[in-house]
UniProtKB/Swiss-Prot annotation:
Entry-linked InterPro entries: Mad1
Protein function: Central component of the spindle assembly checkpoint.
Extent of Basic and acidic residues compositional bias: 15-26
Protein name: Spindle assembly checkpoint component MAD1
Family statement drawn from the similarity comment of this UniProt entry: Belongs to the MAD1 family.
Superkingdom in the source lineage: Eukaryota
Compartment(s): Nucleus
Keywords: Cell cycle, Cell division, Coiled coil, Mitosis, Nucleus
């Protein structure tokens, strides 16, 4: 109440009351300004993000639209190509018919031409069926692409409408922001007017400096924002350039692929033209060959047909088989003659060896005879000497007794008789040997002459006959070879004229076929799902529905197929895992058996990284090694007396666990009763 009546208190009316109120309003205004700026920036960022997303979607739809138009264009081009090919085939058929009508040939040749016409007609029918199928397929694809274009256009219009609505919202927000900025500027003017009433110049100077600093900061923030906007625009431009570059690169690749396909089609067309020319040349050569084989003198056989050629060829082939069999028989006979000649040569060599042995035995016997003759002469000389000695002895020992002389005479007579018997026996044996040698040599000569003459005569006769037959057969072989060359040339021409068929072998149940079948099935399901989803989107856009309560059946089928594929993959993985487990168990058992047989220990792996080791010499005793704690436990200390000493020596001091196990094995072997 004192404040209303104007009391004397100095704090009734504060000189800075209005300033505090202005500052409070200022803080509230700045807080509202920041809040509006934050909302504006958030909305602007959201608008930019949505704009970029809509631009991307618009670009994708435009790209899809261009791709659909390209596919339509390609389909039309291919339809034009098929129509042109059909027209060319019709023209070729008409030309073939005109040529067939102009060329009047034999009945068999007409039959062949008829078969060729039938083949051409079948080919034309097949091509027409293929043309109709391709045309129907391209028509359906064209309709699908039209539907897709319509859906894309509707989506583009929808997104353009959304863009317009968002741009209107942004414009309204901008107008509100401008109004708020105007209010803030008015408040700033009021605040500056009230700041002029401040008596403290130092505070005013500080406020001006702060205001300048804030202005510089605001200017710096604006510059940063502008640079960020420029960079964002540059980034957008670069992204659009990149997307356009990728699009044109893909377009270039598609064009290159089309050019490559056109080159391949042109090459195939040229190859077909060359094959047609080759067929025409072969037909003309065949006609010329038939005309040359015609016999104009004979009225009944004035035409030489292909059946006549086949008959002549079969006759020549049969003759060739007969002559080939005869030639094989002659080869066998010549081989038999060679074998007989070899046997006779072996017998001759054996006879020559026997002759040499007989001659050697004769020479040896003659040497023996000569030696016996020499011994005979020596014995006669000895007899003479003995007689002389006896006579001398007689003269010297007349006083000896007559009994001794008689004994000597008896001995001498016996010696003479024996020598005579020996000489007579030697003469008899010599005469027998000489006679036997003469008889054997004469008999062998006669036998040789008889057998050799007969064998030589027979061999000479056989050789002469075989040489004559061989010369005749060689002449026939040369003739047959010439005929065979001619027939082979004709067969080669006939084979070249025939239609060439290529068969490609393929496994019936190969993994590649399974994968391709699964991919094809998945692709068909995805295509059906895509079609149904497009139709569903069109229905939603036409009926202006906000949500979809149902899903298409194709989506369920595709998910079911993916689930089946995943189940099959799981089954395959389980089978592979079971096989790997079996292999691992088998290999681990082999490893344990090898360690047991080579090192004398059986290993048993336990939980928590422990290994139990059994010795083959004491199966009831064991060692437990903990690989995590590096500890060792055993019940072998009851058997081995110096267990602790060995453990401290080999494990604690030297750190050699293998040597420790080896010493334990030796100790257990020593303790094991044999």
């Amino acid at each position: 109440m004192d404040s209303d009546s104007g009391g004397s208190s100095p704090f009734v009316e504060s000189p800075h009351g209005e300033e505090v109120q202005v500052r409070g309003d200022e803080t509230n205004n700045t807080y509202g300004q920041d809040q509006w700026k934050f909302k504006y920036e958030g909305l602007l960022n959201e608008w930019e993000i949505q704009k970029i997303q809509w631009q991307k979607e618009k670009y994708e739809f435009e790209k899809r639209q261009l791709a659909a138009e390209d596919r339509l264009r390609n389909a039309n081009d291919e339809m034009d190509i098929l129509i042109q090919r059909n027209q060319d085939l019709v023209y070729r058929i008409e030309e073939e018919e005109r040529n067939r009508i102009n060329n009047d040939e034999g009945n068999d040749l007409k039959g062949g031409a008829g078969s060729m016409d039938k083949g051409k007609k079948q080919e034309i029918e097949e091509l027409s069926r293929r043309y109709e199928a391709d045309r129907f397929e391209w028509k359906t694809q064209n309709e699908e692409l039209d539907l897709e274009l319509k859906s894309c256009k509707s989506l583009i219009s929808k997104y353009e409408q959304l863009l317009m609505e968002q741009s209107e919202k942004i414009n309204s927000l901008r107008s509100e922001v401008k109004n708020k900025e105007d209010q803030i500027a008015e408040l700033e003017v009021v605040r500056q007017k009230k700041d002029h009433n401040i008596t403290n110049t130092e505070e005013f100077r500080n406020l001006t400096t702060l205001k300048d600093i804030i202005k510089t900061h605001d200017q710096y923030a604006l510059d940063l924002e502008q640079s960020n906007m420029r960079q964002a625009e540059e980034l957008k431009r670069l992204k659009s350039l990149k997307e356009s570059a990728t699009f044109w690169r893909s377009e270039n690749e598609q064009l290159q692929e089309r050019i490559r396909q056109l080159e391949e089609v042109e090459q195939q067309y040229n190859e077909v033209q060359l094959e047609i020319l080759e067929l025409k040349v072969n037909i003309s050569e065949w006609d010329r060959f038939l005309k040359e084989k015609c016999q104009p003198g004979d009225t009944e056989t004035a035409e030489y047909t292909p059946s006549d050629f086949v008959r002549d060829y079969e006759i020549l082939q049969n003759d060739y088989k007969v002559l080939n069999d005869e030639f094989e028989d002659l080869k066998k006979e010549t081989q038999m003659v060679k074998i007989l000649n070899d046997e006779l040569a072996m017998e001759r060599n054996q006879i020559l060896n026997l002759k040499n042995e007989y001659e050697k035995s004769i020479i040896n016997l003659e040497k023996l005879n000569y030696e016996l003759e020499q011994q005979k002469t020596l014995s006669f000389e000895e007899c003479k000497l003995l007689r002389k000695q006896l006579e001398s002895i007689k003269h010297k020992s007349n006083h000896e007794e007559n009994d001794s002389t008689k004994d000597y005479e008896v001995l001498i007579d016996n010696y003479k008789n024996q020598t005579k018997d020996l000489t007579s026996e030697l003469k008899r044996m010599n005469d027998e040997l000489i006679g036997s040698n003469r008889d054997s040599s004469a008999g062998s000569k006669k036998r040789k002459l008889r057998t050799g003459d007969s064998v030589n005569v027979n061999l000479a006769q056989k050789l002469n006959t075989m040489q004559i037959e061989n010369s005749n057969l060689q002449k026939e072989i040369h003739k047959l070879k010439a005929i065979i060359d001619v027939l082979e040339k004709k067969i080669r021409l006939l084979k070249e004229n025939k239609e060439k068929r290529i068969r490609i072998l393929q496994q019936r149940d190969s993994p590649l076929l399974k994968i391709q079948f699964a991919r094809k099935q998945e692709l068909d399901l995805l295509k059906d799902e895509n079609k149904e989803l497009l139709s569903l989107i069109e229905n939603v856009t036409e009926n202006n529905q906000n949500r979809i309560d149902t899903i298409p059946l194709s989506a369920y089928k595709s998910l079911e197929f993916q689930y089946q594929q995943s189940q099959e993959n799981v089954v395959k993985g389980e089978k592979q895992l079971s096989r790997l487990k079996q292999i691992y168990n088998k290999k681990s058992l082999e490893f344990i058996d090898i360690v047991n047989s080579m090192l004398g220990f059986r290993l048993e792996f336990m939980l928590d990284g422990r290994v139990k080791i059994y010795s083959c010499y004491k199966p009831d005793k064991y060692l437990i090694a903990n690989l995590i704690d590096n500890t060792l436990k055993s019940n072998l200390d009851a058997i081995i007396s110096d267990w602790d000493e060995l453990l401290s020596l080999w494990v604690v001091e030297r750190g050699q666990l293998p040597c420790f196990l080896a010493t334990i094995t030796l100790r257990l072997w020593e303790l094991n009763p044999i």
